[in-house]
Amino acid sequence: MTVATQNLTALDVGLAWRNSFAQLGKSFYTPLAPWPLPAPYWVGRSTSTARELGLSESWLDSPELLQVLTGNQPMAGTQPLASVYSGHQFGQWAGQLGDGRAILLGETGGLEVQLKGSGLTPYSRMGDGRAVLRSSIREFLCSEAMQGLGIATSRALCVVGSDAPIRRETVETAAVVTRVAPSFIRFGHFEHFSHHDQHAQLKVLADYVIDRFYPECRASDKFAGNPYAALLEAVSERTAALVAQWQAVGFCHGVLNTDNMSILGLTIDYGPFQFLDAFNPGHVCNHSDQEGRYAFDKQPNIAYWNLFCLGQALLPLIGEQELAIAALESYKTVFPAAFERLMFAKLGLLDASDSTATVDRALLQDILQLLAREQVDYTIFWRRLSHCGVATDAQTVRDLFVDRSAADAWLLRYSERLEHIPQGLAADLMLKTNPKFVLRNYLGEQAIQAAKLKDFSQVETLLMLLESPFEEHPGFDKYADFPPDWASSIEISCSS
C-alpha cells in the first residue's frame, strides 16, 4: 500500500525502536505505513504516558512529533504493520478480522506504540480505516482514567484531530489516537491460527507470548511441564482480576468480543463503554447491543465464555481437554475472591477475615440490593460513604435514598461493624478505593462538543482530574456531581 510519506526523511525522536512482533513472520501481519492525516492539530496529550515511553516533554510539544504520529512523516527505527486476527463477535464466529484501522509502529522501552485511525489496511473490510474525533477523545480519556483508577489498561499518549471529513451516521471529522501497551495481542490472534489449522503459527505465537510475558509458565509444576495449559491459567487469572476491578468501580465495557480481549489481561478497545451513573446491574451501555449480551452484570460470565474460546484455540497445543478445563477453573476461583476483596475495601473493612465473613458478606449483598432497588448513583454513594465515619453525621448518605428507614437500618449495622476498626483507618482506605471522579458519559460528551469548536480545555481538565481520581481537587466539584437529566439520553454505539 503506497502512501505519500514513503520518500520523506525519517524523523528521530530519541526513542530506541524494535518490533519483536514483526519477527514472527509474514503470516501474522502485513507491513504498511500509516496514511497521512491532513492538517493535524493537537487535541490532548498525556505527559504521564510520555514519561512511560521515555519521550521528553519537549518532543511531546513539538510539531515534528505531530507529523510522525499522523502518518505525515515516518519515524526513524519503526517497522509499521497491521496484524491479522479473527474472533467471536456478539457470540458468533466473525471470521477474519485484524487491525482494520490501526498500525503498530513497533516497541520502545518494552511498550508497543500503535496508531488508531491511521488509514486502510488489508483487514479494513468495509471500513474506511479512519477514526472520528468523538470516539478518539473518549478512548484517550478513558485509557488514562483507568490508569488513574489502578485498573490494568492500554494507555494513550495523545489524540490528534483533523478537519478531514469522515462519514458515519453523519459527517464527522477524523482523528488518530496513539495507543501504548506492552502488547496488543488479543484472544482473536490465537483463534485465527487455530481456526485455520495453522498449528505451527499458533505455537510460534504462544511461545512468543510465553517467553515475553509469561516465562513462569515454562516451569509450571501444576501442569506437568505443559506451558500452554499454564498460559491459559495465567491469562484466566489476569482476566478474572481485571473483570473484578471493572465490576467494583462500575465500568461497563460494552463490546466484549473475543477480539477485544487482551492476552495480558488489559482493558483495551474503548468504544461504547460507560461508568455507571445510577446503579442498575442490568445496564446495557452499547446502543448496538440490542439483546443485552454485554450488560454490566453479564461481564463476568462473558469474560469466562471468551476464555473458553481461547482455551479451544489453544487446545491443539495443550493436547488434553481436561488440562484446558482445569486451567479455566482458576477464573471461577480468582474472580469472586478478587471482587469480594475489592468490595470489602470499598466498605473500609480492612480487617475482613473468615471470622467476619458472614457479617461482611451480608452487609455487601444488602447494600448492593438497596442501591439497585433505589437506583442510587454508584460513584457518589461510595464516595459519600467514605466520608461517613462512626461518629460522623450520615445525612449525606441518607439523602441518596427514598427509603430512609432501609438506609438507616443498613447504616446502623455498618457503623456497628466499623466499631471494630480503629477510627480513621477505614476512611483512609475508602478514600483511596472509592474515586471522586470517573469519566461519566456526559462529561465526555461536553468535552467532545467543545473540542469540535477547537476548545480543548475540557479535555485537559478531565485528563487532570481523571489521572488522580481519588484526590479532592477543590474547585472542581461540579465534575463529581450528579449527571444532568439530559445525560440519560446519550446513546453510545459501536460507531467510531
From Swiss-Prot:
Any Pfam family from its record, for instance, is SelO
Q: Name one GO molecular function term.
A: magnesium ion binding
User: Which cofactors are named for this entry?
Assistant: Mg(2+); Mn(2+)
Chain's gene name: ydiU
- Protein name, per record: Protein nucleotidyltransferase YdiU
Q: Which residues form the active site?
A: 259
UniProt function note: Nucleotidyltransferase involved in the post-translational modification of proteins. It can catalyze the addition of adenosine monophosphate (AMP) or uridine monophosphate (UMP) to a protein, resulting in modifications known as AMPylation and UMPylation.
Keywords of the record: ATP-binding, Magnesium, Manganese, Metal-binding, Nucleotide-binding, Nucleotidyltransferase, Transferase
Residues that hold ATP according to the record = 98, 100-101, 116, 128-129, 179, 186, 269
Substrates-to-products reaction catalysed: L-seryl-[protein] + ATP = 3-O-(5'-adenylyl)-L-seryl-[protein] + diphosphate; L-threonyl-[protein] + ATP = 3-O-(5'-adenylyl)-L-threonyl-[protein] + diphosphate; L-tyrosyl-[protein] + ATP = O-(5'-adenylyl)-L-tyrosyl-[protein] + diphosphate; L-histidyl-[protein] + UTP = N(tele)-(5'-uridylyl)-L-histidyl-[protein] + diphosphate
Spell out the coiled coil positions from the record: none
Q: Where does Mg(2+) bind?
A: 260, 269
What is the E.C. number?
2.7.7.-, 2.7.7.108
Under InterPro entries, the record lists: SelO
- On whether Metal-binding is a keyword of this UniProt record, the answer is yes
The UniProt entry's sequence similarity note says: Belongs to the SELO family.
